[in-house]
Amino acid sequence: MLRLVENHSLAHSAAHSMPRTAAFFDLDKTVIAKSSTLTFSKSFYQGGLINRRAVLRTAYAQFVFLAGGADHDQMERMREYLSALCRGWNVQLVKELVAETLHDLIDPIIYDEAASLIEEHHTAGRDVVIVSTSGAEVVEPIGELLGADRVVATRMIVGDDGCFTGEVEYYAYGPTKAEAIRELAASEGYDLSRCYAYSDSATDLPMLEAVGHPHAVNPDRSLRREALSREWPILDFHRPVRLKQRLGGLSVPPRPALVAAAAIGAAAATAGLVWYASRRRSTAA
C-alpha cells in the first residue's frame, strides 16, 4: 500500500477512468548543466566534510563529466570514489549544507528549456519525476526546487551514529532506473506507452526504452547514435537561467510529501528507494 497524501484519493479515482502519465527526467546535463553531486564540493569543503585535495579531484571529475559525459566504467569509478569519500559524513550536516547553498549553486545552472518542459508536462496533467544517480540528500531538494512530483535517487546506508557508512543501499543507475519507473507505473497507474523520458547518457537507454516517448537531451556520442538510428527526438539545451528570473512573482511549489513504496520490487524496497509526491499533483493525464 502507498501512504496517501493530500488529494491522492482524487487522483486515484481519476486513474480508473483514464490512464495517468508522467515525464521522467534524468538530472545531470539534462535538467541542470553540471553534475549535481560534484557542484556541492566547495560547500562540503567549507563545511569541513572534505579537504582541498578532494575539492581538486571533484573539480577534475566535473571537467571530465562535462567534456564527454561518463560511460559505464567511469560511472562505476565515480560511485566507488564518492562512496568512499562520504564515509563518516554526518547526514544532517550534509542536508543543512545543501539547503544553505541550493539556490546559489543550482538555481543558476537549470536549463531554461528543461524548466519550460517541466511546466508544459504539468500543464498537460502529467506527473514529473526526477530520476538521478546522484544521492537523495542532493536530489530531493533539487526536485523540490523544480516542482517535481517525485524523485528517484541513489541512497547510502546511514549508521546508528547518523553518519554514512560508505555503503550503497540503492544505486539508481542504468537498468535499476528502468525498473524503478516500471514499478512506479504499476503502483500509480501510469501508462508507460504514453509517458515521456529525457536523458543525456547512453547509460539511461533502459529508462528511455521503457516509455513511449523517449528524448535524447544534449546526448553523448553513444546516445546520439542510438537516437538517430531509432528516430528519437534530439533536444539541445544550452540556456541556463535562474528560476527566480524566469518565474517572476510565482510562489515556490509546496514541499513534496513522502510516499512509502511497497510494490517496488524486493531489491528496491530493501534499498529504501524514495519517491516524493507533490500535494499539488494533477489528477489526470
Predicted regions and their residues:
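Short, surface-exposed helix-loop/turn micro-motifs enriched in polar/charged residues
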Residues: 32, 74, 130-131
